[in-house]
Each structure stands twice: as C-alpha cells, then as structure tokens.
Amino acid sequence: MRAPDFWRKDNAVSRLLAPLGAIYGWAVRRNLERAEEYRPAVPVICVGNIVVGGAGKTPVGIALARRLIAAGVKPHFLTRGYGGTEVGPRAVDLDRHDFARVGDEALLLAREAPTWVSRWRPDGAVAATEMGAEVIIMDDGFQNGSIAKDLSLVVVDGSYGFGNGRTMPAGPCREPPDQGLARADAMVVIGKDRRGLAELARAHGIPLLAARLVPGPEGADLKGRKVVAFAGIGRPEKFFASLKQCGARLTADHSFPDHHPFTRADIEALLAEAEANEALLITTAKDRVRLPADLRARVAVLSVSLDWDAPSLLTPLFDRIGVRA
C-alpha cells in the first residue's frame, strides 16, 4: 500500500479519522498490557518502529549482527516472515526458500546470520536458542507482547519522523509516539534529523543513536550513467535519492507498493524502457529477491549499509544486557 499524503502532514482528513486512530492506539496498548510474555534464555534485541514501513529496520538489524559477530557473539534473527506463507518456526535456507515462502526481509537477514521465521515468536525464540543463538535480534515486533525484550530500539527516518503523529488510519503510526517511546531503550535516527527527534528522545530520557545509509561499492560505477530505477519498498524516494547521491542520471523512476511481488510482465516492461533509453535498469537488494529468478541477472542492484555516527554509543546498551560487543 502507498501512504496517503495526509499521513505526512495533518489535514482535515486526518483529523476526521482521528477517533478511529485513538481506538487503534488503545487496542495496541491493551493487547500489550494483557499479553503473557515468554522470556527466552538469551537476550532479545528488538529492532522495531512506530510508523508503518520504510524506517530502515533491516539495515539496523544487519549492522547490529555484524558488530556482534565481530565480537565473537552468535546472533540469530527472528522475524515473522511478512509476505511469506511459512508459519514456522523454520530456519531460512537460502538454497531452498524464496520470498513467497519466507518473505523478502528474511532472505536479506539470512545472508548475515541464522534466521528464523515464526509467526508465533516464542516458538522461534526456543528454536533459535536450541540451535546455539547467544543473542536474538528480533526484526520488528515492537508492538508484539508475546516475547520479552531486553533491549528495544525504535528506528525512525530523520526526514519523516512520525509523519503527522497520528495513529492509523489517521496517520502512519502503529501507536501514539509517546506511548511507544515510553517502552523504548533508544531511538535510532537514520539520516539528518529534520523533525525534532533529538528533543523528543531527551524528553523520554532515552539516548539517540544517529546513523546514515551508505551506498554500496557498486555505486561508484553509476556516476554519470543513465538509469531507470524502480523500487517496491516503504519509501522508494530514499532509494532514488541514493542513486542521485552516487551521480546516476535518472531517466525514470517507478514506485511500487511495499513488498510488491514483481511479475514477469512488470520486469519485461521495465527492461524494455531501459533499453529504449539506453539506460541501466536498477533496483534495491530487497526488491531483487522478489524478481522472477531468470530475470535477476538483467537488473542491477544498489545495496546500502548502515554507518553509525558514534558507534561507541552502542557499548552501554550492549553492556546493559550483558553482551560484550
């Protein structure tokens, strides 16, 4: 789904829908209060957000896993496998599973560390622990009360913040921001803070970890090159901006709904457009796993990684949960 414009800036429509948003936020709070938490035998780091889609949870989770692995700690990812049919608990096998089975995010995470798909998260946590996980990194699930979290990081896009600040359907928030931040241990802000997020973090007494998304090494080859870009992610404009940052010349850009299952017709039409413009067809790593397998080699990818402004700020957070990293 594409976010309506009024999710970014308050207007008459969002105000009209505000009572429904209040009910939604109340339901989230009630479910959390009534939930019976399962506490795994190992620490759980939740990488979540308050708004729907596009905050940057996956790069944050990958960055955390890489730091833990470098310190000799064995992290496992736990995800519900959004967009896939797998109920789990199931360990993701990159040789056997595709996005239709386990979801696109699980395929990206599994390149970095063992990854479990489980609709009922406690079952996935048990499986991960039995298979040697020393830390569980939970992808999303900040509003899920079925599993106890030892460290909760709320990921926020610096330019979007919490949109108009209202709860769905009146705004992009899964719950009122103040309600969510009251449970958070830290806020991760990706990109320049244009929404007063530092002040909000201070008001809630939590640290702010600033970070930015850095284009992968393949970006160096894009300078001056004509490209036709497409993406089906939460905020495709961020991907298009990254291409321009690399010096690419965007002949066209196409936005698809988040998690869009690309058809052969979709990609063949885009390939034809790129050929007609003597341009390179390019997408994101997350989108690539949803392309027809035999067409992937014809589509370039610009990857991104997370770069912390002050990596040392992670140390006290890890110390708090007894992890040396």
UniProtKB/Swiss-Prot annotation:
EC number(s) stated in the UniProt entry for this protein: 2.7.1.130
Enzyme class: transferase
GO terms for biological process, alphabetical: lipid A biosynthetic process; lipopolysaccharide core region biosynthetic process
UniProt-recorded Gene Ontology molecular function terms: ATP binding; tetraacyldisaccharide 4'-kinase activity
GO-annotated cellular components: plasma membrane
Any Pfam family the entry gives: LpxK
Binding site for ATP: V51, V52, G53, G54, A55, G56, K57, T58
Domain of life: Bacteria
Catalytic activity field: a lipid A disaccharide + ATP = a lipid IVA + ADP + H(+)
Pathway: Glycolipid biosynthesis; lipid IV(A) biosynthesis; lipid IV(A) from (3R)-3-hydroxytetradecanoyl-[acyl-carrier-protein] and UDP-N-acetyl-alpha-D-glucosamine: step 6/6
Keyword flag Lipid biosynthesis: yes
Xref: InterPro entries: LpxK, P-loop_NTPase
Keywords linked to the UniProt accession: ATP-binding, Kinase, Lipid A biosynthesis, Lipid biosynthesis, Lipid metabolism, Nucleotide-binding, Transferase
Function text: Transfers the gamma-phosphate of ATP to the 4'-position of a tetraacyldisaccharide 1-phosphate intermediate (termed DS-1-P) to form tetraacyldisaccharide 1,4'-bis-phosphate (lipid IVA).
Xref: PANTHER family: TETRAACYLDISACCHARIDE 4'-KINASE, TETRAACYLDISACCHARIDE 4'-KINASE, MITOCHONDRIAL-RELATED
HAMAP family xrefs: LpxK
Family stated for the protein in its record: Belongs to the LpxK family.
Protein name in the entry: Tetraacyldisaccharide 4'-kinase
Organism field: Paramagnetospirillum magneticum (strain ATCC 700264 / AMB-1) (Magnetospirillum magneticum)
Gene that this polypeptide is encoded by: lpxK
